[in-house]
UniProtKB/Swiss-Prot annotation:
Role, per record: Lethal neurotoxin. Selectively blocks tetrodotoxin-sensitive voltage-gated sodium channels (Nav). Does not affect tetrodotoxin-resistant voltage-gated sodium channels or calcium channels.
Domain notes: The presence of a 'disulfide through disulfide knot' structurally defines this protein as a knottin.
Protein name listed in UniProt: Mu-theraphotoxin-Hhn2j 3
Keywords tagged on the record: Amidation, Disulfide bond, Ion channel impairing toxin, Knottin, Neurotoxin, Presynaptic neurotoxin, Secreted, Signal, Toxin, Voltage-gated sodium channel impairing toxin
Length: 83
């Protein structure tokens, strides 16, 4: 009984993968499928023109993103609350 349930589940998974593959025309199908299954996005290394929260910075150079400010004490970007 356990083997029958396992085979039925494996068949459904295989049917899902084959159906998804037939609709996909991209060459990066395995990566796309794994990222959808595990909800993991591939890091593409997009560069920003500013530094985000926790990034090291130099006070006075205005390197941090909008709504962030460089901390004089810790030398990293923090959220600017406006005093």
């Amino acid at each position: 009984m356990k083997a029958l349930m396992f085979l039925a589940l494996a068949g459904l998974v295989l049917l899902f993968v084959v159906g998804y593959a037939s609709e996909s025309e991209e060459k990066e199908f395995p990566i796309e499928l794994l990222s959808k299954i595990f909800a993991v996005d591939v890091f593409k290394g997009e560069e920003r023109g500013c530094k985000g929260f926790g990034d090291s910075c130099t006070p006075g150079k205005n390197e941090c993103c909008p709504n962030h400010a460089c901390s004089n004490k810790h030398k990293w970007c923090k959220v600017y609350l406006g005093k």
